[in-house]
Curated annotation (Swiss-Prot):
This is Protease HtpX. The lineage of its organism: Bacteria, Pseudomonadati, Pseudomonadota, Gammaproteobacteria, Pasteurellales. GO terms for molecular function: metalloendopeptidase activity; zinc ion binding. It comes from Haemophilus ducreyi (strain 35000HP / ATCC 700724). Its EC number is 3.4.24.-. Zn(2+) binds at residues 144, 148, 223.
């Protein structure tokens, strides 16, 4: 699984999980039993989108801290000047404001783009990529990241994740309310608080896994689109060459806690949880353009 979407998803899931617990506490303290479907849905929307929006607006600063990168204010050497010129040229061609640029020290052959909006975005590449790829290949990788920004992928992912969060919280609460509810000897509705909490938290974890599968499927779809965007900016042969290069380099190590927003490369795992399609499929899709 790639370093790019993982941090966003983990941050989002953590925030949503904590907010879900806070929601439980609010209901218990206020005495709300969760019987109002409309009320639960509104609260689920509020808490579901809060998690994804916080993740979105934190994405750029978190990405920079995670890799220890600093934004290039003024190119200091040939590599930085080349990257600056390449990003500037491609962003103009794609019709977006020029993103911030960063180079981070890592042996991984990788790059990522992140940021809350097209006006506040970041493109970062590793020293491993600059050391191991030709200029044509590196140019294609940068174009791939520019395509992610131009396509508005981070915002789209945020909206999708907000919807998924909402359903996770809503379904968990509705089911846990039904399972934990009963009637006393007088026919009054009662609720087993312990059962409610246990079932609600367990269901949020289960539904959260299913939501992650959906998010990963959408991420794979976006990778194909970004590859096509790169092909439009620099030509498909350069993008194919970049992907072929990735097949001959070591698989990148996972970062502590993962990272970021739009990595060009990804570590293979079971397909349902892969944020990127297999390189072979991406190359085949480009050749069929």
């Amino acid at each position: 699984m790639s370093k790019r979407v993982i941090l966003f998803l983990l941050t989002n899931l953590a925030i949503t999980f904590v907010l879900g617990i806070v929601l439980n506490i609010i209901f218990q303290v206020t005495g709300i039993k969760g019987t109002s479907t409309t009320g639960i849905l509104m609260m689920s929307l509020l808490f579901g989108f809060t998690g994804s929006l916080i993740s979105l607006f934190m994405s750029k600063s978190m990405a920079l801290r995670s890799v220890g990168a600093e934004v290039i204010q003024q190119p200091r050497n040939q590599a930085e000047q080349w990257l600056f010129n390449t990003v500037q040229r491609q962003s103009q061609k794609a019709g977006i404001p020029m993103p911030d640029i960063a180079i981070y020290h890592s042996a991984d052959v990788n790059a990522f783009a992140t940021g809350a909006t097209k006006n506040n975005s970041l493109v970062a590449v590793s020293t491993g990529l600059l050391d191991n790829m030709t200029e044509d290949e590196a140019e294609a990788v940068v174009a791939h990241e520019i395509a992610h920004i131009a396509n508005g992928d981070m915002v789209t992912m945020t909206l999708l994740q907000g919807v998924l969060n909402t359903f996770v919280i809503f379904l968990s609460r509705m089911i846990s309310t039904a399972v934990s509810g009963s009637r006393d000897e007088n026919g009054n509705s009662t609720q087993n608080t312990l059962v409610f909490w246990v079932v609600d938290i367990a269901l949020q974890m289960i539904f959260g896994i299913l939501a992650t599968m959906i998010a990963m499927w959408f991420s794979r779809y976006r990778e194909y689109r970004a590859d096509m965007g790169s092909a439009q900016l620099v030509g498909k042969e350069k993008m194919i060459a970049a992907l072929e290069r990735l097949r001959h380099v070591h698989e990148p190590q996972e970062m502590q806690g993962s990272l970021s927003a739009f990595m060009i490369n990804g570590i293979r795992s079971k397909e349902l949880f892969m944020s990127h399609p297999p390189l072979e499929k991406r190359i085949e899709a480009l050749r069929n353009l």
